[in-house]
C-alpha cells in the first residue's frame, strides 16, 4: 500500500486536521458522503484569532465526523518556542528584522501531537489542508511518519475527484448549503493568515506582489504602528531569565510558560514589536514572501541576546549564531526532531542557555523601536573597570603589557605583508610605490 493515497479510502477511518473553516468542513462532509469514516482532530495552539475552540469539535460532529477531539498543544508549543529561543534557531533575517519560525514550530507540535492522538483511536490515515506548493505538506509528512511509521497520507486537495467536484471556495460553500448547513462563506481578505500562540503569518493573494506591503495587513497580535492615528506610548519593561528560561515580566513571575507567552504577546503587541516583512526560500527552493508577527518572542529574544552578549565570549557567541542559522533551516524544513537538530539545540541549551541568568530592562516605543536601559546578571563577563578610560586600582594589565602584546603582533604582520607581495607578483594585487594599502589588480585576462 502506497504511503500517499490519491483516492479516498472508502470504508476506512480517515483522520483530518480540522480547523472548522470552510475547506476542512467541506472536506469532512464530502469524505463522509463518499463512504469514508472521518475522524476530526483540532489543535489548540492558542491562535489569537480563534474565539471558541470548544465549538470546533461540535461542528465536526454535526458535519458527520465519527469522533472529534480537541488536543491542547499550547504547553508543548511554549516549550518548543523556548527551545528555539535558547538556540537562536532563526535563519530568515532581513536588515536586522527576524522571522521567529513560528509556523514551523507550530507544525512540529501539531504534526506529532495530532498523529499521536489518531494512533490512540486506531486511525492510521491522515489528511490536512496543506497544498502541494507549500512547506507544510512536507513538514506534516515528516512529522506524521516519525510519530506513526504505519501512517498513510490522504489529502482531499490531491484527490482529482475532490478537486473536480469541490475545486474552489464558491463550490465548497454551495456544497455545504446544499447539504443543509447553510455555510456562509466569509468575506475574502487580501491575504491569508495562519497563526498560533507564538506568532502569525500573513501571505498569499495581494501579498504575493512586492508592491503590496505591511500597510494592507490588519495585525491580529498587535497594533498597526505605522498608522498615525494609532496611539503608542513608550513603556518600560523588564524581562528576567534563569538558566536560559524566561521566568518573569515586569517583576511578575510565571510558572506556566503559556501564560508567560500570552503576557509577553500583550506587552509587545501594544507596540507592534516583532512585525516584519521577509522574502524567504521555501523548502522547494522557490522564493515566497510573508508578513510576520511575533510580539512576545521578539521581546524575549531582545533580552536573551543581550544577556548572551554580556555573558559569553566571542567564540561561543559565534558558534551559537552559526549553529542557530543551521538549526533554523532544519526547523523550517520540518526536521526539528531529526538527530542533527537535536544535537544542535542540546548544545545551545546546555552550554549557552544554562549560563543565561539575569534581567534586562527596555523601553519599548513604536514598532521595532526600542532602547535597552539596563542589563543585570551575576554571570556577566562584561566588567567596566577592565577597559575604563579612567585610572583604576588593580588594573588587569599595564601599558607595558600592551607593548609586549603589540610586539608579538609583528610576527603575523610580517607574514601578511610577505603574502601580499606574493599576490602582487602574481598580478592579483598592486603594491605600487609606497602604497599603504594593497589594491586589487585586474586578473580578468589570467586563466
From Swiss-Prot:
Enzyme Commission number: 6.3.4.5
GO CC annotations, alphabetized: cytoplasm
GO terms of biological process kind: argininosuccinate metabolic process; L-arginine biosynthetic process; urea cycle
Binding residue positions for L-aspartate: 131, 135-136
Predominant location: cytoplasm
Enzyme class: ligase
GO molecular function: argininosuccinate synthase activity; ATP binding; protein homodimerization activity
Disulfides per UniProt: none
Binding site for ATP: 17-25, 43, 129, 131, 136, 194
InterPro entries associated with the record: Arg_succ_synth_type2_subfam, Arginosuc_syn_C, Arginosuc_syn_N, Arginosuc_synth, Arginosuc_synth_CS, Arginosuc_synth_type_1_subfam, AS_cat/multimer_dom_body, AS_multimer_C_tail
UniProt keyword Cytoplasm present: yes
Annotated signal sequence range: none
Residue numbers binding L-citrulline: 99, 135, 139, 192, 201, 203, 280
Catalytic activity, as annotated: L-citrulline + L-aspartate + ATP = 2-(N(omega)-L-arginino)succinate + AMP + diphosphate + H(+)
Pathway given in the UniProt record: Amino-acid biosynthesis; L-arginine biosynthesis; L-arginine from L-ornithine and carbamoyl phosphate: step 2/3
PROSITE patterns: ARGININOSUCCIN_SYN_1, ARGININOSUCCIN_SYN_2
Family per similarity comment: Belongs to the argininosuccinate synthase family. Type 2 subfamily.
Subunit structure as annotated in this protein's UniProt entry: Homotetramer.
This protein's name: Argininosuccinate synthase
